[in-house]
A protein has these predicted regions:
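N-terminal targeting leaders
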Residues: 2-161
Length: 161
């Protein structure tokens, strides 16, 4: 049973080492990133989380190591703790888009190991709290980091984490 799991992890490691560059020739995006809403015109655009080739290799190594350890210990699903991040990210984005309370906000989402980071702009503190509660209730979300800004915002693009 352990050999197929180790083989799967080795294939995952090889795939993680070869991501496709997304924006610039020397940057890579490993985690799913999506804009859910765009209703706050004054909100600066959030840039996706990108890595240099060196950062990407270090991240790939630690991700494979983490996945192998928890798989062998039986504390997580084999195949990596990042396996379901794209579907979690899409589900969270859809939930935000489908909730009328957030139509006047601009919200970007990044998911890493079932940890969801919210960035962008909301109108009120109450809206920020409601957004966080909505995201926490989504299936498979382990943790929410709500980095949204309330009200008027500073100018210039924000870098996603």
């Amino acid at each position: 049973m352990r050999m197929p799991a180790l083989r799967s992890l080795a294939l995952l490691a090889a795939a993680a080492a070869l991501p496709t560059p997304l924006f610039a020739t020397d940057t890579y995006q490993l985690d799913p990133f999506e804009q859910a809403t765009a209703g706050f015109a004054a909100c600066p655009t959030v840039a996706p989380p990108t890595l240099t080739p060196e950062q990407m290799r270090a991240q790939a190594h630690s991700r494979v190591e983490r996945g192998t350890s928890c798989c062998l210990a039986g504390t997580c699903e084999c195949g990596g703790s990042y396996k379901h991040d794209p579907e979690i990210n899409a589900r969270v984005a859809a939930a935000i888009r489908n909730d009328r309370r957030f139509r006047d906000a601009s919200i970007w989402i990044t998911t890493t190991r079932k940890f969801v980071t919210l960035q962008g702009c909301v109108r009120t503190t109450a809206q920020k709290r409601s957004l966080e509660r909505l995201v926490r209730r989504q299936p498979d979300v382990a943790l929410v980091w709500n980095e949204t800004t309330v009200g008027p915002v500073r100018h210039g693009p924000l870098q996603a984490k």
